[in-house]
């Protein structure tokens, strides 16, 4: 679910590092919202879009 359908941003993986430098796996999830978008053919569709794409104006809200 956590994937932007506009830019393809998805879950990133890495390490959580403690003060004693112990490492354990963790994930970073993108801030994805489900919004209604107006497509080029005039159709309305509900898709997952990250907030950076919404802020940049890459999608037109319906």
UniProtKB/Swiss-Prot annotation:
Return the GO cellular component terms, semicolon-separated: ribonucleoprotein complex; ribosome
**GO terms for molecular function, please?**
structural constituent of ribosome
Keywords for the protein's UniProt record, in alphabetical order = Ribonucleoprotein, Ribosomal protein
Taxonomy, superkingdom? Bacteria
Which stretches are annotated as coiled coil? none
InterPro entries, alphabetized: Bacterial_rp_bL28 (IPR050096), Ribosomal_bL28 (IPR026569), Ribosomal_bL28/bL31-like_sf (IPR034704), Ribosomal_bL28_bact-type (IPR001383), Ribosomal_bL28_sf (IPR037147)
Name the GO terms of the biological process aspect: translation
Q: What PANTHER family does the annotation carry?
A: 50S RIBOSOMAL PROTEIN L28, LARGE RIBOSOMAL SUBUNIT PROTEIN BL28A
Q: Which family does it belong to?
A: Belongs to the bacterial ribosomal protein bL28 family.
State the name under which the record lists this protein: Large ribosomal subunit protein bL28
